[in-house]
């Protein structure tokens, strides 16, 4: 999906761009708030933003310009709301991850009053200008959505400017709380995707479909991936060399590993199935924009590429874990997929042999039926986790239904070996059970994928 990430990427000549004080949105880019904000941001000595909510899509659009503004030495303050949970945690994490503490980011905290302002204030050497209207920070609100915004200068209307800015200062200083790591984590853990967010996301998606299709798509972290990346950066800053990420299937753990390992030169990705390795290779290729990788599995034993995707069955053999193939410190970053298997012999040999700068374990199911402890392998360090339930509540995964169907198959005559049904007997029971086959097909036809 195409992304507007900076003024350069949208290929607009701002020096000759038509400037207007009245922005009404729609398809004409000259009437969209985003392009006017960029012009103001390029010159401002400080920026104050007050909006009722932040969406990841809007933050992503403004991120590069905010970063350039900070590099020029300008100060940025942002006050937003947390009422009804419309502000997305990923939007806040994105600001924290890319801009850090250089931005003074706060929540409006007075519970007794509604909070719906939308204003962008830019301060220059001899004057200020203020945009006020209907646009929060989301893609559609900043671009083609029908939003009415007006800009005026402190020189042309000093009295009204003073009133607006005085109110902003009062709200920011006296009616806000700083969004530090603790507050952000608390907000994220309690956040459920509100119903209205579905409409906002739909508007943003529709807007992305109408963007300039000549812009090269960028692979960038989304949602929970942004939160997990922040957690991983924090844990490394504290000195951790190993970590386990627990995330439900569908969150995007492989892409997360690709994003997190991007700064490391030599990376090893370990999984137990060839299909997973090939899919992971494509993900890493897209994130790194490089096909310089190889596989270590079956008959293929690549050892000279910066990215190696290895099967446990091959790499886990003692004859391959030596200097002839890989030095123990060859890889800077090691990813162990399906980390709940890491207590098994082949996985353990791999984990114990290599000495990377950082080891990342990925799993959706950390609990094991045999009671073996996988947490000790990653030094009991789990910086981020998101369950299936949380993923659904946050709108990152689709909800589903379980259907319990009674099965009359008789298991009483099967032998139990080491606490389990004898595998051959169980297979015969299933394979030769025509009634069970018909039952499965009947209810498959009834429910399908609804």
Q: Where is each model-derived feature located?
A:
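Pre-Walker A adenine-sensing motif
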Residues: 225-237
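Conserved helix-turn-beta segment of the N-terminal RecA-like "Helicase ATP-binding" lobe
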Residues: 267, 275-300
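PLD/PLD-like phosphodiesterase catalytic module centered on the HKD motif
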Residues: 1-222, 226
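Conserved RecA-like ASCE P-loop NTPase motor core of nucleic-acid helicases/translocases
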Residues: 52, 267-273, 450
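Post-DEXD/H (motif II) to motif III coupling segment of the RecA-like Helicase ATP-binding lobe
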Residues: 340-402
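Walker A/P-loop
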Residues: 237-260
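Conserved interdomain linker/interface between the two RecA-like ATPase lobes of SF2 helicase motors
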Residues: 382-449
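Conserved helix/coil segment N-terminal to the catalytic DExD/H
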Residues: 298-330, 344-349
């Amino acid at each position: 999906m195409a992304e507007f990430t900076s003024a350069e990427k949208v290929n607009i000549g701002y020096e000759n761009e038509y400037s207007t004080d009245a922005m009404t949105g729609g398809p004409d880019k000259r009437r969209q708030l985003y392009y006017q904000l960029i012009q103001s941001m390029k010159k401002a000595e400080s920026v104050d933003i007050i909006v009722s909510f932040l969406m990841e899509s809007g933050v992503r659009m403004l991120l590069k310009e905010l970063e350039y503004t900070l590099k020029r030495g300008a100060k940025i303050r942002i006050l937003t709301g947390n009422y009804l949970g419309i502000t997305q945690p990923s939007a806040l994490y994105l600001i924290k991850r890319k801009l850090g503490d250089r931005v003074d980011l706060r929540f409006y905290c007075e519970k007794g009053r509604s909070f719906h302002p939308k204003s962008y204030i830019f301060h220059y050497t001899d004057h200020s200008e203020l945009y006020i209207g209907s646009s929060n920070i989301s893609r559609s609100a900043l671009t083609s959505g029908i939003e009415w915004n007006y800009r005026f200068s402190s020189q042309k209307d000093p009295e009204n400017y003073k009133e607006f800015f005085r109110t902003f200062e009062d709200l920011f200083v006296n009616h806000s709380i700083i969004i530090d790591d603790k507050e952000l984590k608390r907000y994220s853990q309690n956040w459920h995707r509100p119903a209205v967010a579905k409409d906002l996301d739909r508007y943003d998606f529709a807007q992305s479909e109408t963007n300039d299709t000549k812009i090269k798509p960028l692979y960038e972290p989304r949602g929970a991936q942004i939160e997990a990346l922040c957690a991983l950066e924090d844990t490394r800053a504290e000195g951790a060399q190993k970590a386990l990420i627990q995330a439900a299937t569908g969150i995007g753990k492989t892409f997360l590993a690709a994003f997190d390992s991007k700064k490391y030169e030599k990376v090893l990705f370990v999984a137990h199935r060839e299909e997973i390795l090939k899919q992971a290779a494509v993900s890493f290729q897209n994130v790194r924009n490089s096909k310089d990788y190889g596989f270590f599995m079956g008959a293929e034993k690549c050892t000279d590429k910066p990215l190696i995707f290895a099967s446990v069955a091959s790499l886990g053999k003692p004859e391959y874990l030596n200097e002839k193939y890989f030095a123990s410190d060859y890889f800077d970053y090691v990813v162990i997929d399906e980390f709940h298997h890491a207590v098994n012999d082949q996985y353990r040999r791999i984990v114990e042999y290599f000495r990377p700068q950082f080891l990342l374990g990925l799993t959706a199911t950390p609990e094991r039926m045999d009671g073996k402890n996988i947490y000790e392998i990653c030094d009991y360090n789990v910086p981020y986790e998101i369950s299936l339930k949380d993923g659904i509540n946050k709108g990152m995964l689709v909800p589903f239904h379980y259907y319990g169907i009674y099965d009359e198959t008789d298991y009483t005559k099967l032998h139990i070996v080491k606490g389990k049904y004898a595998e051959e007997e169980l297979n015969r029971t299933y394979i030769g059970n025509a009634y069970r086959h018909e039952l499965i097909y009947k209810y498959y036809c009834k429910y399908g994928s609804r």
